[in-house]
Amino acid sequence: MTTYLVQEDTYNTNNLDFKIRRVPESFSTFVIDFKAFFGVRPQHVSRRFSISLSDLSYQPKIYNPRADWAVTAAFTSFEALQASTLDPVQRFATIGTGSGTDAIAALDVFPHLRSIVMTDLHDEVVDKAKINLMSAAEKADGRVRTVARDATGLSGHSLVPLKGQEPFDLIYENLPNIPLPDDADLLDGQTSSTYFDCSDVSGVVPSFVSKALLDLHYVCLLQARTFDLLTESGVVLSSMGGRVPIDTMLQLADAAGFTGRIPSMSWKVQSEPDSVIEGYATLQEKGLGPFYFYRVSTLRHVFGHLTGAEAGLHALEIENELLPDRLDAVMALKAHKQGIDIGHPVVVMASTRQ
């Protein structure tokens, strides 16, 4: 595997200078500095590691970590969970892993981790993710290297690939929200990172969940319970863009037979804004939602220097503080086209069985 390093650029996010090694976009291998990407020094994985991507992999936002889900949702929520629970996370699964950076985050945060399962829709995506996980553990201690080496990659929809597995202490999911347009193909590039085939869940999901475009998050909880995939104290972490009320998310958990809470909350720049915001705007005009976005300047001001865990403790207060400045999807699309940077809160819900 060849790595191409061309130059080193500096970005400023939340008053931290992030140095990212730039690689030509035509190549599919990158070198990531852990601190540059996640914002803190690694505890257990290698300080620098390479990642390889399939054409079908969700592209990590290495040039703008504030737009990356592994940074704003996975790593932040893992830290919050590790700090708030006495139950060690030993068995971990990530659903829709993409490049595998969420699994790398788990390997670094959870000191008792002994088993990782990564899933995605495509075999080649999870194959690359496994390679990336091993790269991140290359210079780590023996336990970490063994966990990475023995990690399992499975392909399939939602939690179906996990059926029959030994129960997990933690299942993390960050699944798409927008129904697949008639003229789109889930096998085309990164389409499956943004869209899902709503025919797969037709008739299963409560109407209030579908109206909020949270279908797959509900399905994951339902499958976790039906397939008996959680230990007695096991948790499902659902990573959701805060474009709908937090109360709707908590009601979703209850409808699936779980008790939900918000251990972590952050914000991110809207990635792929042309297609994503337009997708939400189109569906809002058809009667779904409404869906809300915010100017990046507003999000930066309201969240300030709060950690994910601190923001999670005050999630409803933050939501109320943002209300006067919210833009529905149609307004957000217009603002984006005017050159205004648009983002949204990132809400991670922890669900335990009732």
Give the ranges of each region predicted by the language model.
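SAM-dependent Rossmann-like transferase core, predominantly class I methyltransferases
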Residues: 4-112, 292-350
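A generic structural motif
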Residues: 144-155, 261-274
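C-terminal beta-strand of the catalytic ATP-binding
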Residues: 175, 351-354
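Short aromatic-enriched loop/helix-cap "lid" or pocket-rim segments at secondary-structure transitions
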Residues: 179-187, 249-251, 273-276
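Conserved Class I SAM-dependent methyltransferase catalytic core
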Residues: 208-268
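Short, surface-exposed amphipathic charged segments that create phosphate/polyanion-binding patches used
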Residues: 274-286
